[in-house]
Amino acid sequence: MNMYIERIGQGPDLVLLHGWGLNGAVWQEIVPLLQPYYRLHLVDLPGFGYSRDVIMPDSRLATWSETVLAELPARFDLLGWSMGGLIALRMALDHPSRINRLILTGSSPCFLRQDNWPGIHPDVLSGFNCALQQNPRKTIERFLAIQSMGSESVKEDVKRLKSWLQQRPDAAPAALSAGLALLSSVDLRTELSQLRCPVLGIYGRQDSLVPAAAVDPIEKLITGSRSVVFAQAAHAPFISHPQQFSEALRQFLEQNEIQRD
């Protein structure tokens, strides 16, 4: 079974990868702002949304990357949010000739808190994993609330996230567990110096999952990258601040023009 990918708009190809527990509907706030300029590929990752029944042979990050990449254009720009950012990084590292430019939002090469590395406390992730086995939907809704905390439009953000979640089939339990395992175990920090494409990070200063304290360390690990931090945004700045987010993305792509065949 093929993944579900919604394709909208005209122009250079821009692929969007959503985060844990959600689906491609999460981009609805920025789609109208971007579709006049780009051919958008809104992916439902394997096991999520309309791709619920897409089964991968294993749950390694490279397998997520290869499974998604197999259904994408020959060359494209790539936007990854949260867990989708990990998959996007793996793609860009393994297939530099396919990725023109990379935008990461609310994402980190290592989500787990480490010595001298800001991130999510291990107890939080293990707690989510335990709760997931008992009540998946309630666990996802709790996750949505946590990632919206601190946003100046927190109630509206959570309401919209829940609405988009309900528009498509529930995620497969195996995909939810595999996604949490990625967030708990993947650490790409030592590989970031190998990235060859221009990279932009867009963050929210109120993000409790990718703390603002991680922004500078991430930027230092990616040669030539730049970051934008929205003071009143949390984990999903493209939802709380769609206009500013779209402007930052478009400016980055325009300033880093790629020679096309």
Swiss-Prot record:
Amino acids binding substrate: 20, 82-83, 143-147, 235
Example of a GO cellular component annotation carried by this entry: membrane
A biological-process GO annotation: biotin biosynthetic process
Assembly: Monomer.
Highest rank taxon of the organism: Bacteria
Pathway stated in the Swiss-Prot or TrEMBL entry: Cofactor biosynthesis; biotin biosynthesis
Cited function: The physiological role of BioH is to remove the methyl group introduced by BioC when the pimeloyl moiety is complete. It allows to synthesize pimeloyl-ACP via the fatty acid synthetic pathway through the hydrolysis of the ester bonds of pimeloyl-ACP esters.
Primary localisation category: cytoplasm
Name this polypeptide is given: Pimeloyl-[acyl-carrier protein] methyl ester esterase
UniProt-listed InterPro entries: AB_hydrolase_1 (IPR000073), AB_hydrolase_fold (IPR029058), AB_hydrolase_sf (IPR050266), BioH (IPR010076)
Ranges of residues in domain AB hydrolase-1: 14-242
Localization in the cell: Cytoplasm
Pfam family, any one: Abhydrolase_1
Gene Ontology MF terms in the entry: pimelyl-[acyl-carrier protein] methyl ester esterase activity
Organism field: Tolumonas auensis (strain DSM 9187 / NBRC 110442 / TA 4)
EC number annotated for this UniProt entry: 3.1.1.85
Record: active site: 82, 207, 235
Similarity-based family: Belongs to the AB hydrolase superfamily. Carboxylesterase BioH family.
Keywords: Biotin biosynthesis, Cytoplasm, Hydrolase, Serine esterase
Recorded catalytic activity of this chain's protein: 6-carboxyhexanoyl-[ACP] methyl ester + H2O = 6-carboxyhexanoyl-[ACP] + methanol + H(+)
